Every structure is written in C-alpha cells, then in structure tokens.
Amino acid sequence: LFHFLISVPFKKQYLANIEKGINPLRWYEYAFSSSIMIVLLSVLFGITSIEGLLGVFGINAVMNLLGLLMEKMNPPNRTKTDWTAHFVGWIAGFIPWIIILFYLLNFGDLSLLPWFVLPGLSFYFLVFNLFAFNQILQYARVGKWKDYVYGEKSYVWLSLIGKSTLAWLVFLGIVLN
C-alpha cells in the first residue's frame, strides 16, 4: 500500500521530500507496518495480553518516529549531526526484542521449537537492526550513503527483505502449529 501511495497519489510530495533529504511517509509507514510485524512475532512467542501487545506496538512505533525526528533534526546542509534521536531509537527498538527474548527463554526446551524459528528470528533481528546501521551510514555520510537517495534505496530493500522474512516466519508458524 505504501509503495502504491508514494508512486501514484503522493509521488510529487515524495520526490520533493527526497530532494530535501527527508521522507516522512517512510517513517509513518514503518511506525505502522513494523509495529504490526513485531506484534505478530510477539504473538508467535506467546505474548497474548492486550497490554503487552499494545506496549510492544507503541514502543516500536515510537522508535520509528524517532527515525523521522532524526531526519528533521539533521537536514542535508547541516555542519554537525545530532545523534540524540537515533540513539534513543536504539533504546526504544531493543525493548520489544527484550520482551520477546524473555518469552523465548521461558518457553522451556528450545529444541521443541520448529527448525526455522531460531534461524528465522536471528535473521529478522539482523535485518531489523540494519535499518539503524543504514541510518548511521547515511548521516555519517559514509561512501555511497553520502547520497541520500542511496540510503533511501537501502531502506526500500531492507523493508522488502524484512517484511518477506517475517511473512515466511508467520506463515510457517501458522502452518506448522
């Protein structure tokens, strides 16, 4: 849906924002879709209370909105990068993973988990955190990331890989349960 919106009705706004070194639509979409994804993952590991799932959703959404704040605080013509929003986002981003880890460790015998769970979860965790490293490279202006568009394309690929990975994890979790 997001990619349709930016390619058709919001294309001019999207391209104008990219020229300014900011993409608010990305961060709003991530705040929603990434939070849905982490909630689905949470459910797979036994988190079923509404307050627990709302907490995971909310703190994950805040993490993504801190990505938007990072962009707003650091326009392309800056002389110095303010990393505050980025590193507060790391803290917020790890909280849902810590909660999932607690549930995973309380599962009991991890050998009873389906074969795909631990490798899939590890890969998804890696991809999830590559978003933050992409932002570091982009705002530190390292190599190809000096060009905002390169970082933007990296976000698109990471999003595709992350969503596909989680879709397979959820699908396998449903089919094999």
PLM feature segments, named:
Residues 1-25, 34-177:
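Polytopic alpha-helical membrane-helix bundles and their juxtamembrane interface segments
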